[in-house]
Amino acid sequence: MRDVNLAKYQFDYDLTWAGLFVSPDGRVLGRYGGRDAESADGKVSLKGLRYAMEAARKANRERPPPKAAPERRTVADYPGLKRLGPTACVHCHQVHELQRDALQARGEWGLDKLWVYPPPENVGLTLEVDRGNVVARVAPKSAAEKAGLRQGDVIRTIGGEPVASFADAQYALHRHESNEPLAAVWLRDGKEMAGKLELADGWRKSDISWRWSLRQLEPSPWVHGDDLTSQEKKALGLGEKRLALRQGNFVTPPARQAGIRQNDIIIGVDGRELEMTGRQFPVYVKLNYKVGDKVTYNLLRDGKRVDVELTLAGRP
C-alpha cells in the first residue's frame, strides 16, 4: 500500500481480500468484497463477483468520464509512516492505523471513528450474496423498513453511490458519517422508487472484533488465549455465551506482575459478568477503559474464584 493512491482506491483496508473495478480512464466503477464478524467469506461468491463485474461493465458504458484527475494521497502523507522504516511493507490494515495516528496527533480522533464501513444490516438490509444489490431480507422496524424497502427490491443507489454488491453498500454507508437521513433509490417490478433511511444514534456500530487494525489501539488488556468450549463452560457452571478466556502459555509482563497465571480463566471485569467471546474481549477493554486505568479481572483458577487487579499500562 506504500504507493497506492488512497484518494482513488478507497476500500475497507481491514479486509483479507478486496476488489475494485476500474475503467481505463481511471474511474472506480464498483467494489467487491466485504465481510462481517461471523465469517471472512460469507458475503462473497463467484456468482456475486460476476454479477458485480457485469454491473461495472455496464457502468463503464453509461457513466461520463471524469472531469479531472483525482487528488493523490498516499501513506507517505501520514507522519506515522516514519516508524515503519523507508523500505517496510505497508499492509492494508496499517492504512487504518496510520489514519488513526494522524487524527490522534491532531486531537481529532474519538471512539466514534472506529466504526468504519458499517454493514448494510445496520440499516436493516440483508443483501443476497449472488446478487449483491437485491434485498434478501428487511429487518422489522429498521430504517430500511421505514423507508419502504421490501424483500426482492433491487437497490440502485444509497447516498448517491451506485450499489451492485455488499462492498458497494458498505462504501456508501461509510461515506455517510452523520445521523442525517440517507437517500436510497431502488427498483420494484421495474419501477423506480425512492425513500430516506432515518438513522438512529449509534447506527454505525457493529461487532468490529475481527479488525486487525484494532490490535495496536490502546489500552491492551494484556491477556490473551482461547475460548473454553461449550462443554468446558458447562462443567464450570457458566452459560454458553459467557466470557471464558483461558490465558495462554505466554503471560505478558503486566499480567504476570499483577498475578495472572497460565491457564487462568477470565470470566469478567470489575464484577461484570460479560457475555462475549475471547476475540471480542480486547475490543471491550479498548472501548471502555483508558491507559492507566486499574481493572479487576475476575478469574477462575483451579475452579475457584480469584480477583486480580491490573493496571492497563501503555505499550513501551
Task: Describe each region flagged by the PLM.
Residues 8-12:
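Short consensus segments that form the blades of beta-propeller domains
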Residues 35-124, 129:
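Sequence context surrounding c-type heme c attachment/ligation sites in exported
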Residues 1-4:
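Thiol-based oxidoreductase modules, predominantly thioredoxin-like and allied folds used
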Residues 35, 161, 169, 199-200, ...:
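A generic structural motif
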Residues 156, 171-210, 258-261, 267, ...:
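PDZ-domain C-terminal substructure recognizer with occasional recognition of PDZ-binding tails
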Residues 16-35:
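A short, hydrophobic beta-strand/beta-hairpin element that forms part of a small beta-sheet core
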Residues 117-157, 161-164, 221-268, 272-276:
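PDZ/PDZ-like domain segments forming the peptide/carboxylate-binding groove
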Residues 90-137, 196-245, 307-316:
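PDZ/PDZ-like peptide-tail recognition elements
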